[in-house]
Amino acid sequence: MWINLIKEFMQDLRKQKLRTSLTIIAICWGTIAVIALLAFGEGLNRQLLSGLRGGGNQIMMFYGGQTSQSFEGLDAGRRIRFAEEDVELFRRSIPQIESISAQYGRSVSLKSDYATTNTYMEGVDVPFEDMRTMYPVAGGRFLNARDVAEQRRVVFLGPAVAEQLFPDGNAIGNRLMIDNNPYTVVGVMQEKMQMAMSHGPDSRRAVIPHSTFRQTYNHAFLGSVLIRPVHPEYQKRIEHQVREIMARKYRFHHDDMQAIQVWDFIEAERIQAQIGLGIKIFLFSVGFFTLLIAGVGVANIMYVVVKERTREIGVKKAIGAKNRHIISQFIFEALFICMIGGSIGVLIAAGIVTGVQSLELQGGVADFLGNPVLSADAMIMTTGVLTMIGLAAGVFPARRAALVNPVESLRYE
């Protein structure tokens, strides 16, 4: 049966070479549009997510603020600030916390044998590395537990600062002065995409153990507290518990949103996911309508084929061919046209995406758009659309063919 259907399709193809070829090209172009647009959309979405996580990887950053309500005889406008003991209190009291880090911060002067510069320095704990995606290049490391416990004078540098202070590229293991205190460089951060930042990008950051920072600068209060839940679903619960604990300790109303400020990267990721979905839907819609126009061409060809083969259809029905045989023949031909055009389009689109990926573009627009990504979702969606269009383009002409009256069709010229 399938062999006969293919033979009949090839005969029709020879009769309608130009029209069929143009339709296949249209299907091919529509397929390229759908896959390429979705690939670039997926690349953009991943790049935006990477840039967001460059500032905070599924964390919440809590900052002290000012009370906006009077409470138990205390006036509004009081300053609320975090201390290191609060970090330990959160760690003991909130089991949904996966990791937590204190964070001090101030501007400092750094001096090496080659250069002097000013930058923002933070005093943090060990989990800060993963929470802020500050991973070291080969040969170096981030701060460890012994650095914190022993208040070591070690520093982890952002790549821009490291290049400025050590232009020969040998920062790791060398010494520098921070506010006239000697430190050893234990690591340099890998380059990363960062779209959310405070006090400048992490590439210009210097990081030391929070214990060393406190001992050196005698800071009583933290700049912020970073918390990552064991699961994003605990985000609101942890925020509520932090507010409750701080409200009891520092005597303010737990619903006073101004007393504690939160920079919520988990919520930002949810918003980004919704934006990414919107981009996907929009780009898919553009490609879908391109394919839909091509599908009209397929339907047009099938109507022409039905008209030209009216006498043949009548003969088949006269000798016993059933309607389902007639319908399946034209649906198969429509699907086959879509399959040929779609297959060529998939190969070309894959080649375009692979070619762009191989260029490894960096800087400027490339840093924002990212590299296109061929995803399984895009392939499944495209296949589904092609099948739907093929069926729609074949069903209506096929039904018309099935309704042909054998007697009348035999007189058709």
Predicted features and spans:
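Short cytosolic juxtamembrane segments of multi-pass membrane proteins
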Residues: 3-4, 398-413
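Transmembrane alpha-helical interface segments in multi-pass membrane proteins
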Residues: 5-10, 14, 18-26, 33, ...
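Alpha-helical membrane-interface segments at transmembrane helix boundaries
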Residues: 10, 14, 41-45, 49, ...
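Hydrophobic, regular-secondary-structure patches
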Residues: 42-120, 127-130, 145-146, 163-164, ...
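Short juxtamembrane loops and helix-capping segments at transmembrane helix boundaries
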Residues: 53-55, 351-380
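Short helix-coil transition/hinge motifs at the ends and kinks of transmembrane helices
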Residues: 68-76, 194-199, 251-257, 358-373
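Mid-to-C-terminal secondary-structure elements
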Residues: 127-142, 152-253
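Peri-transmembrane interface segments
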Residues: 226, 242, 253-287
